């Protein structure tokens, strides 16, 4: 899979990761993780769902940055 979007933020010993990757013949693999735990993981075949997920990721990343999280 090749990454379309990837962002990892850290605060102290905590880590949050967001990723969208192209999944050949399936569509896109979307995942959100907190430390080692999977918060959400989905496969999408519709790019519009991926776009909505990217908007949500960007809102969440902005909120985390306001809370003091920084790029890893």
Model-derived regions: residue spans:
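Short, surface-exposed linear segments at secondary-structure transitions and domain or protein termini
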Residues: 26-30, 48-57
């Amino acid at each position: 899979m090749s990454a379309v979007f990837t962002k990892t933020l850290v605060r102290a010993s905590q880590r949050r990761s967001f990723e969208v990757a192209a999944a050949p013949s399936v569509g896109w693999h979307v995942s959100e993780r907190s430390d080692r735990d999977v918060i959400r993981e989905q496969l999408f075949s519709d790019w519009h769902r991926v776009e909505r997920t990217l908007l949500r990721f960007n809102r969440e990343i902005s909120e985390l940055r306001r809370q003091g999280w920084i790029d890893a």
